[in-house]
């Protein structure tokens, strides 16, 4: 029983780490060009002031905005091959950094 629980715990942690790594890679691929420097008014990664009002919209709305494009941001940012779920991972990654 302990082995069963431990193996599932390890598998869950490996999966969570993979998602974190995936989110970072997606961010670097499609978001960092603007969100690391504030290009065209993009809120910078980790900047609490710039994200404060936006973060109140919640992950789902921010993901939809990123998917559709908003303001100076094109649809899907610079990740035209990303799925909705990948865009969501990138949004979650950015929110976790504030």
Residue ranges with predicted function:
Residues 35-64:
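Gly/Gly-Pro-rich "capping" loops immediately C-terminal to redox-active cysteine motifs
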Residues 21-30, 40:
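Local sequence-structure signature of Cys/Sec-based thiol-disulfide redox active-site neighborhoods
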Residues 44, 65-89, 94-97:
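Axial heme c-ligation environment in periplasmic c-type cytochrome domains
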Residues 28-37, 90:
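The canonical Cys-X-X-Cys-His
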Residues 1-21, 98:
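N-terminal export/targeting leaders of redox proteins
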Residues 22, 26, 50, 61, ...:
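Extracytoplasmic/secreted proteins, especially bacterial periplasmic and envelope-associated proteins
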């Amino acid at each position: 029983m302990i082995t069963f629980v431990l193996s599932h715990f390890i598998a869950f942690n490996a999966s969570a780490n993979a998602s974190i790594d995936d989110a970072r890679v997606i961010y670097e691929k499609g978001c960092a060009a603007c969100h690391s420097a504030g290009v065209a008014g993009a809120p910078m990664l980790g900047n609490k002031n710039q994200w404060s009002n936006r973060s109140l919209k919640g992950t789902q709305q921010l993901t939809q905005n990123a998917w559709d494009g908003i303001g100076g941001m094109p649809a899907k940012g610079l990740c035209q091959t990303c799925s909705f779920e990948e865009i969501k991972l990138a949004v979650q990654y950015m929110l976790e950094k504030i």
